[in-house]
Amino acid sequence: MEELQGYLEEYRSRQQQFLYPLLFQEYIYVFAYDHGLNSSIFYEPQNSLGYDNKFSSVLVKRLIIRMYQKNYWIYSVNDIYQNIFVGHNNYFYFHFFSQILSEGFAVIVEIPFSLQLISSLEEKEIPKSHNLQSSHSIFPFLEDKLLHLNYLSDILIPYPAHMEILVQMLQSWIQDALSLHLLQFLLHEYYNWNSLIIPNKSIYVFSKDNKRLFCFLYNLYIYEYEFLLVFPCKQSSFLRLISSGVLLERIHFYVKIEHLGVCRIFCQKTLWIFKDPFIHYIRYQGKSILGSRGTHFLMKKWKYHLVHFWQYYFHFWSQPYRIDTKKLSNYSFYFLGYFSSVQMNSSMVRNQMLENSFLMDTLTKKLDTRIPIIPLIRSLSKAQFCTVSGYPISKPIWTDLADCDIINRFGRICRKLSHYHSGSSKKQSLYRMKYILRLSCARTLARKHKSSARSFLQRLSSGLLEEFFTEEEQVISLIFPKRTSFYLYGSYRERIWYLDIIRINDLVNSLLVTT
């Protein structure tokens, strides 16, 4: 990033902050290859063109040479439209070059945002904490904050209706008109190609072929969406100490906020419209949660605010059913693979004062997290480890592997699933998942050797069992070697949140998506 920052500073001085000339530099595509994180086009095999999944500098140089040609893209697109139903060679060839260009373009537009993030962290002196990157790091926050809230809104973030909205958002950040025209060209042509080749396809087709660029545009859209939510929260916390008498006129609301921010007229009056000092916001995988300690009427105001701002700011109709508001004490919400709810635990305490004794019923709140067994079985069934009803079956595609490789694969999947779902307060679902994977492993081995699954379970009972141990269970088995099975199948009930889960396993990810 430091080297890339040096290139950017050089081009800023020469080209007056133009990003477009960077597309003609080969090192940009090298950066796209190095930092692709398995989402770059250079990692994906192009069987239709005969290329492998290695980075090809020859293709990049050929692309740069063709971009220097005048009106190359216009002539290529016209040629594709004329011959689209005659042959697909020109289409796939040009489509491949467009994907490479989109990868390089994604790297370029990320540069200003990356530099701004680095400078912001340095100014605020925020230390880099890798533990906060874990998906489990949010659950201790929920255990601490969620118990004091009354209502919860489950929000389904809508997708932008038109790609031109994304370009308009980027225009406020990047002043390079040529880069914006190139982005419009890529989005427009991909939409036309997909409508010709694969009709009735949405923006999802574009995201499959251009993961990095679409991820950047989607994150930009999410940033604008969250700004509409964070702005009233910041203003409400600030305006609680500011006179709100002049804010009763809603016509020039935001202009008056700016003037009030300078005047700082302290008063006991409060802004009643958005006042909510106990509001919390969490976003995950296209969804978000808005928790509040206020009343149901206040949550309706937030819903009204979000729906109308989506309509007027993003220019598309947003259905009110995308925001579901429930009372937290009577509501179980799905969050990152867990069904979470706030439970009231009753405990009897005996108090004695002098000669009199009496019992007191004490109620305490506790965040309960459980694994939904039906989506878990559905995910295992989709991966062909069991049937839809949860009956374990063999994995025929793995029968060509060695026995140790088969056992290691099943054990690795089981440990990763157990590692991610270790925060469940009820372990029955985990035990059933381990049973399905263990029996599926035995039946896969039996199918390979044309034997019975019972014989493999008897022959490899101890070794096969150890492969499905999780980390915490391995520690317990070392401390209590004679009581391993007892701890494995019923005694170990503590919730554990790990701070090293940076990337989610594919099977876990499919579980999160299917639910």
UniProtKB/Swiss-Prot annotation:
Transmembrane segments: none annotated. It comes from Alpinia calcarata (Snap ginger). This is Maturase K. GO terms for biological process: mRNA processing; RNA splicing; tRNA processing. Keywords: Chloroplast, mRNA processing, Plastid, RNA-binding, tRNA processing. GO terms for cellular component: chloroplast. It holds the Pfam family MatK_N. Belongs to the intron maturase 2 family. MatK subfamily. It is found in: Plastid, Chloroplast. Usually encoded in the trnK tRNA gene intron. Probably assists in splicing its own and other chloroplast group II introns.
